[in-house]
Amino acid sequence: SGPGLIYGKGLTREESRLPGVGNKAISLKDCRNVTLKDLSMLHCGHFALLATGVDHLTILNLKVDTNRDGFDIDCCRNVRISQCTVNSPWDDAIVLKASYGLGRFQDTENVTISDCYVSGFDKGSVMDGTWQLDEPQAPDHGFRTGRIKFGTESSGGFRNIAITNCIFEHCRGLALE
């Protein structure tokens, strides 16, 4: 935790197969008691945060401005996401999954998303305060997303999920897939 910027300029927005080229700003797997607080993240590759199998994850007051996924919460338990701004014009801002990423089925459960702002403004424009809508549409699907979504790649379930007091702007809202 603590103020600072993670600048992922060298990350790719695609799945990386090149040596030394990454596609995630932060990746957590099979962790417990993790807190991410008071950080800014810019141009974060394919995932700003990929959390898989994390128990007791707190994400508080993060500002993310990227062109792909903001937070991917997969097979996690006891997660609190609060007071975050996630701008992700070409993909999902916050996505909850229950995939087979751990090599076993595991639900995503006990998740609270509150007091967050998700959007689909041009990448980088929320971080610099200009809030622009000049970029052409996303090259792979033709529309802005920036939403909160449940279900991508999921084979497990979801239990005890609460989304409260969140603002959705220039995005596709809440999606169930």
Predicted regions and their residues:
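Extracellular/periplasmic carbohydrate-active domains that bind, remodel
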Residues: 1-177
